[in-house]
Curated annotation (Swiss-Prot):
PANTHER family recorded: PEROXYNITRITE ISOMERASE THAP4, THAP4 PROTEIN
Entry similarity comment: Belongs to the nitrobindin family.
Protein's name according to its UniProt entry: Ferric nitrobindin-like protein
SUPFAM superfamilies the UniProt entry points to: Lipocalins
């Protein structure tokens, strides 16, 4: 039985479902490559979205190749006074996102939601002793297209002593509206 969506999630409801598509990734000292990706946003009745992403290289024949990475986490909405920042010149913080990576690091993002667009900046990045030395990230997610059925995203990453720069971007089609 499907849980009823928590009312605080209305602002993020446009993300719900399963998204699939193609993207491109590249970083200094790494050859650029195409990938296929699946992202799922689900809910379980609690005041957060469950998030899961899986990425595979694209083979020369266009088929799905070897796994590249995955990540999972939770998207939480801030409401009322909790969304307001101490500095009135700063935009409110609408969402907190926690994402963990098998490369041995986790990120806590703070972000804003406007219409069908989410912009996230890392607040904290922690890693294991042997984890990828990630220092900061910026992500942008948004719907576009005639029926707003395409989820575009861009991920900038600062890692391996490099400054924040483009890392991955993709255009994904909604293939399942299940929430």
């Amino acid at each position: 039985m499907q849980s009823e969506m928590h009312p605080e999630l209305a602002k993020l409801s446009f993300l719900l479902g399963r998204w699939e598509g193609l993207g491109v990734a590249g970083y200094p000292d790494t050859e650029e490559f195409q990938f296929t990706q699946v992202i799922e946003f689900t809910h379980d009745g609690h005041p957060h979205l469950n998030y899961r992403s899986q990425v595979w290289r694209v083979n020369e024949d266009g088929s799905r190749g070897e796994p590249v990475t995955s990540e999972s986490g939770y998207w939480r909405v801030r409401t009322g006074k909790a969304a307001q920042q101490e500095d009135p010149d700063q935009p409110p913080i609408h969402v907190e996102v926690l994402i963990s990576h098998p490369e041995g690091y986790s990120e806590v993002y703070l972000g804003t939601v406007f219409a069908h667009r989410v912009e996230l900046h890392t607040d904290v990045v922690v890693r294991t002793e042997t984890g990828l030395p990630a220092a900061a990230s910026h992500r942008l997610y948004g719907l576009f297209g005639d029926n707003r059925e395409t989820l575009g995203y861009a991920w900038d990453l600062a890692a391996n002593s490099k400054e924040l720069q483009p890392y991955m971007s993709a255009q994904l089609q909604r293939v399942d509206r299940k929430s």
